[in-house]
Amino acid sequence: MVKGPGLYTEIGKKARDLLYKDHNSDQKFSITTFSPAGVAITSTGTKKGDLLLGDVAFQSRRKNITTDLKVCTDSTFLITATVDEAAPGLRSIFSFKVPDQNSGKVELQYLHEYAGISTSMGLTQNPTVNFSGVIGSNVLAVGTDVSFDTKSGNFTKINAGLSFTKEDLIASLTVNDKGDLLNASYYHIVNPLFNTAVGAEVSHKLSSKDSTITVGTQHSLDPLTSVKARVNSAGIASALIQHEWKPKSFFTISGEVDTKSIDKSAKVGLALALKP
């Protein structure tokens, strides 16, 4: 595997995962099984308030080609084909949704020791073209992420980011929404033995002068059980406990409360993921 700056989406990812991953206020259940031919079948059901959503996903691997098919309750089909290492460091992704005739997209990703590039284009008459690139190393990296609408001739997205990584910390700064939104994040490993880490994110919108500060932490109570907590400057506090009761199978309980309106009911989320 190439060690380098990675793709643009990885800038600030460690802090985002610590602060937001697995926190939810829904009830979610998923189970994965394997057919005799080796096809992975994952059934997922989610309850959002009074709304019930579900999908069934099929994944097949043949050498360096992975094919995914997802069938959703809204009668749509999402098909994705991924080809890894067609050339050293290159990944090709082709996807489309049925019956949406304008959903086709092709994406190319290339990872190098000193660069990470991703480009995608919609398979339509006037597609939107996206390009993201990162240069640097696994210590210091700088990159950009832009989208161009060929129909209007305008840039619909212009983002830029910077990341600094050491053994126990990662700091990043991104400028999004064409320079209107600034995000700074920090991730620090406090105790590797117990997977203890802290993270923080500061967001500032220049047009409205609104700022949000979010801080959080994670800690492993034992090799199979971990806890996470976060709070932001708006007074929203969240916490979760996750237990791996068998390999690759997780049970997660999460909660969220508005500390400025304690008369409101707390939001509680449950998630169960079963894998053989």
From Swiss-Prot:
Transmembrane segments: none annotated. InterPro entries: Porin_dom_sf, Porin_Euk, Porin_Euk/Tom40. GO terms for biological process: defense response; response to bacterium. GO terms for molecular function: porin activity; voltage-gated monoatomic anion channel activity. Pfam families: Porin_3. CDD domains: Porin3_VDAC (cd07306). It is found in: Mitochondrion outer membrane. It comes from the Eukaryota. Keywords: Ion transport, Membrane, Mitochondrion, Mitochondrion outer membrane, Plant defense, Porin, Transmembrane, Transmembrane beta strand, Transport. The keyword Membrane applies. Expressed in shoot meristems, root meristematic zone, lateral roots, leaves, stigma and anthers. The keyword tRNA-binding does not apply. PROSITE patterns: EUKARYOTIC_PORIN (PS00558). Disruption phenotype: In vdac1-6 homozygous plants, normal growth, but small siliques and decreased pollen germination rate and tube length. Induction: By the bacterial pathogen P.syringae pv. tomato. Coiled coil: none annotated. GO terms for cellular component: chloroplast; chloroplast envelope; cytosol; mitochondrial outer membrane; mitochondrion; plant-type vacuole; plasma membrane; pore complex. Forms a channel through the mitochondrial outer membrane that allows diffusion of small hydrophilic molecules. The channel adopts an open conformation at low or zero membrane potential and a closed conformation at potentials above 30-40 mV. The open state has a weak anion selectivity whereas the closed state is cation-selective. Involved in plant development at reproductive stage, is important for pollen development and may regulate hydrogen peroxide generation during disease resistance. Belongs to the eukaryotic mitochondrial porin (TC 1.B.8.1) family. Consists mainly of membrane-spanning sided beta-sheets. This is Mitochondrial outer membrane protein porin 1. It comes from Arabidopsis thaliana (Mouse-ear cress).
